[in-house]
């Protein structure tokens, strides 16, 4: 088990929480499961009262404390010889102004796995930047990354580089990735699996009102999204042809979700305003006149709705481009 940083939300979590977490980690070690923990930036080791400084002596498994990249453990894991490389960012000691390029590799027999709580490329706020070219040249069999909460994978040289993501979300802006990341090292290479984890789902759904012609259609879309186990935020976008009230929608449909938010980001267009725009000698005016001709020529309700939606989409695109 590899923890690539930010096990805790802060460097000095409540002691009761620390003891519960350490007891759970100890169960892994007692079961013969290898464990490596790398501090992150939320639970940074820099501080004198950091949880990792306070519990360094009795932390289960391998605790990374060195401020620069180095070999932190070599041993048998799952019947294979494995060499682990990592660092614990330490303010004032760990180089952070430019992406790290000094990435060691002993060349010894066995697998070589790097574990970094960092970001690929240039530095971001409160991040440890890692040089892509250096990671690719280091020749690791696998690179486990933390810091970015969204799951992602890429290959640098022969090395698979993986962000597992945050398993359980913290909110709508950080919804999490409800999967474990399981890495299998076989004779033919590395196989990465992402089995699902049963956690509460956090979703952000978008409904484009330009496609809808009545409040009833909107209600049907919301009903279709219902999930009593999920936190859901619905964003209403596009150009609306009818009146809506986000609070009323929440009131009518909240029982279909564990938690429901509706945010109205739509625009509405007054028919009289469209008519005035259509009389103008502008690109927008010419577009409105052309679509008006199509509306008048429509022979079926389907053709009329298609022309109406095209008009609204076009006006919205012209507004955004302006």
Report the location of each language-model feature.
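Glycine-rich phosphate/diphosphate-binding loops that line cofactor/substrate pockets in enzymes
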Residues: 1, 30, 225-227
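N-terminal active-site segment of His-dependent metallophosphoesterases
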Residues: 1-24, 308-322
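Conserved residues at the C-terminal ends of beta-strands
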Residues: 4, 146, 237
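Beta-strand-connecting loop/turn residues
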Residues: 6, 158-159, 188
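Short acidic, S/G/P-rich loop/turn micro-motifs used as interaction or catalytic elements
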Residues: 8, 91-92, 239-243
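His/Asp/Glu-rich metal-coordinating catalytic cores
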Residues: 11-162, 166-171, 175-179, 184
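Accessory, non-catalytic peripheral segments of nucleic-acid enzymes
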Residues: 187-322
């Amino acid at each position: 088990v590899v923890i690539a940083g930010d096990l805790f939300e802060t460097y000095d979590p409540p002691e009761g929480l620390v003891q519960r977490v350490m007891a759970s980690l100890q169960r892994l070690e007692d079961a013969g499961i290898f464990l490596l923990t790398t501090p992150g930036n939320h639970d940074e080791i820099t501080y004198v009262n950091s949880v990792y400084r306070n519990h360094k002596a009795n932390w289960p498994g391998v605790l990374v404390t060195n401020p620069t990249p180095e070999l932190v453990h070599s041993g048998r894991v799952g019947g294979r010889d494995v060499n682990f490389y990592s660092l614990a960012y330490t303010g004032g000691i760990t180089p952070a102004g430019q992406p790290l390029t000094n990435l060691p590799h002993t060349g010894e027999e066995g697998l070589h796995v790097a574990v970094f709580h960092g970001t690929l490329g240039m530095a971001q706020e409160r991040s440890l930047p890692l040089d892509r070219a250096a990671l690719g040249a280091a020749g690791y069999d696998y690179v486990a990354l933390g810091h970015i909460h969204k799951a992602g994978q890429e290959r640098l040289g022969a090395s698979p580089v993986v962000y597992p993501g945050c398993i359980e979300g913290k909110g709508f802006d950080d919804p999490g990735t409800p999967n474990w990341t399981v890495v299998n090292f076989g004779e033919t290479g590395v196989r990465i699996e992402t089995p699902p984890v049963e956690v509460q789902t956090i979703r952000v759904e978008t409904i484009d009102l330009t496609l809808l012609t009545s409040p009833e259609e909107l209600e049907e879309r919301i009903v279709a999204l219902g999930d009593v186990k999920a936190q859901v935020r619905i964003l209403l976008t596009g150009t609306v042809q009818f009146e809506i009230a986000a609070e009323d929608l929440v009131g009518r449909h909240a029982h279909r979700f564990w938690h429901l938010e509706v945010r109205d980001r739509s625009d509405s267009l007054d028919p009289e305003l469209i008519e005035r725009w259509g009389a103008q000698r502008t690109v927008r005016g010419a577009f409105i006149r052309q679509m008006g001709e199509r509306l008048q020529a429509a022979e079926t309700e389907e053709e009329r709705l298609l022309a109406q939606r095209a008009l609204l989409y076009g006006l919205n695109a012209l507004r955004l481009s302006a």
